[in-house]
Amino acid sequence: MLNCKRLVLLLVLWVAASAAAQQPYMPNSFHGLESEGEIPADLKKSLRELYNEDKQRMRDYNDGRLKNRDMVLAVSYNINRLTSNGRILYGDPITKTIERIADTLLKDYPELRGQLRFYTVKSASVNAFATGQGMIFVNLGLVAQVENEAQLAFVIGHEIIHYYRKHTWEEVSRNRQRASSPEQQMQHFLRYHHRSREMENEADSLGLTLFYINSPYDKRVSEGIFDVLQFADQPFGQVEITRQLFDSPYYKLPDSYFLNQVTPVTPRDYYNDTLSTHPDLQSRRKHTSHILQGTQGGEAYVLTTPEQFEQLRLLARMECIRQDLIYGQYTRAYYNCLVLLQQYADNPFLISAKAQALYGLAKQKTYTGTMAVEHYEDFDGEIQQLYHLFGKLKADEASLLATRELWAAHKKLPTDGYIDHMCQDMLQLLYSKHAMNPKDFATTFDTAARHPASDSSSTPDGKYARFKQKQHTASSTFNPKYAFTDLLQEDTTFSRWLNQYMTAANPAKVGPSSDKGVFLFAPGYFVTDLKDGGIKYRKSDHQEELLPTMVAQAAKGNNLTTTDFSDPTLRQHDDAQFYNDFVALNEWTNEFWQTRGAVPKCMSTQPQMDQLIARYGADKLSLNMVANAEYYQKVSALTGIGAMMFGTMLFPLMPLTINFLASNKEMTTTYNYFIDTRSGRVLDKNDNIINYRDSKALVTNSIYSNIYKGMNRRAPIGYMGKRLSVSVNGALDFPLLKLLYFDRISRAVEFRPSLNVEYTLNKTKSLSLWCDYLPTRMWVESNPDELIANMTDLFLTWRHYLNGNTAPLGPYWGFGATLSHVALSTQEQANGSQMALRYLKNHYLIPGLQIEFGRNYIFGNKIVFNYGARYTLTLANPFKPEWDNTNIGTTSRQEMNETRTRRSLYGNIWMTNLFVFSLGVGLLPL
């Protein structure tokens, strides 16, 4: 008998364990839905792979012809963005149920079933859509709103038809217009999912006749599912918003914060929803009812029980609330918590989420004002009252209510450290932002203030007395000093917290840890063509794949390691753990991005982020986006002529003038945020707009500077912190210019090697020291033969780099001083003869002034390539004097010949150094 009982007990335990294994998500321990199993191939495909597959699909649809190649690429790009946005679920209980429903609907179509993959999207919108690639996405918002399994099956069957009938490729085949602006790009993306009325009717008809009618599901589905779609913008239920939800015994909100009545919920049958994927609900409802007329039978639940489906729906609803907290939809999150708490009063997640919503609202109002709440007239039903109330709340009132809500959550969940952290933060906020301190809050209520003594000179029931009574009541009950009176009376712990955390002792900001690495997460790169319009998808994708390497190099330059969560890295992993971490980092980043760090707060996703910090040893995040706009600027004839005249007048600028007229114009904008992931505090951010192409060096250095400033609180000096560059140059000068001065020249162009050392002073300025050597020949007056001249020039130049570029990267201009050493000899002297120079010395030192223009390119963060032009004004008089009979007597012929010869030499040096064009290559050693 005992053995039998033991056997029964073991059997019960085994069943319980099996049930627990099948239900890993228990509502009372909910922290968010996660994916399970190996990462599907759909989520790891590159744009290149997807585009090649889509081109073949388009050929198959059009009898071998590839129509609208650009639109096919746009479809591939948008799907690639969708599958890598970190909001896709796979292998979780909801997705598995959707897959099982599809198995049931397609039991007679195994080939079609094999072509389909199903995923759930972490989105609160009520929607589902199919793609031409065989992926069907169901938003959690739809699962959260459907009433039973049959309604979900109807929607799935509908979406299967969109794939089966190739509606995506039909739309692409018809559409020939390319979007020419970001707004039109979004319209095209929405239109890609926006089917025509005929397609919707076809999906309804065939979905019913091919799949649904032959399934075991309830044939009375049409009314229920279209009710769900009709009221898709409504919360999970209706709960009346009364002042009792917010008033305390001694502190009440003004009557003006509450509407006399709310706008009744209006049907959406006739709503012209041009951005909806499934418009015209009324006609679809009638059409579906007509098809199902005469059919009967079926069950609302086939694969699940009502209790199991309710649990799945609850998971979807809680995840929707969680997503609303992430994306700053605090009013909707709070209201849906109220709805669910009516049934699940002790659910820890709902209690915490309700407090988080009010906490987030108070923080938003404190730091951003009225932007925190949407206008209440945009909503109907009972939730309208909550939008009105939250919109009316002042920042200090919202903070007081949030503190009360957090304290109530703390009492229910005393071991939840995250709630404690928010409560303590809110008490500090009351002190620092709203100038409140513990002494401001009364422990007893002044009843005399609430019930003023009657005036013997007036009638107690008179209307003026009632006005005065209302005024006195308002002045007491709306007074924030009574906001915590009941808590102070009932709980000494609250009084202790008030005194401990509502003080000037603001926790010191802890700097970033130098021994922990940097999270590299999904950097974005967008290249647009402003001439043809739209995004250059393939170039954007290619550059985006290179961007993680640039971030890693920038971090390495700051002696930091990187933990790479970019899309290319995701494709190299198979395990769900990495994918779920990718999603967690994405959610934390999205929550941060709602305010871009302008609202310091305890983020709802911080517990997940803390786990990532511990797992990967990184506590900083580098967020990076690059936008490059290409445009071919047509130069007018007048502008071109003017530029050429300018270049001719200032001959050294001629190469740059030609480059301006011939080159493609680009503008590059880099956005970089360096964030402390322990607190969400922005350590540094920079937005740079540069009217040049998006070189790797430019982007890498902007990220490096962002990280450097975040770690050191000061700007770096020099490209990637390197202050010294050394280069070897080959320069060309043009003796041809001597024809302006002499009637003969030795050669037209001369080569002069040079060495350049450049030292960076600050971000945009540097000192450059040049030394070049030129063996040349000169025709000098009074010397019948060519003279051999060995010129050594030193140039000390102050440089300024343009458009915010960091020295020594990018275009520059400079000015400085020169010193030319000229060693002269004759051909005979070179051959060993002692024949002297006539009227000249063997050595000359001649100073000068210089201006220069150039540009440096940097490759691999080490190699420098440069080109430039410099113009030198030699400080020696090159003009030969003329003597007449009046002064010939006072000047000896010897002196006259010496002067003319010397100035002839100066003329040679002038023209030799007048214009020099150089090309060089060097290194950044330090």
Question: Which residues are covered by each model-predicted region?
Answer:
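C-terminal/domain-edge helix-coil "capping" segments
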Residues: 200, 490-520, 525-531, 602-605, ...
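Residues that define the transmembrane beta-barrel architecture of outer-membrane proteins
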Residues: 666, 722-724, 747-753, 786-794, ...
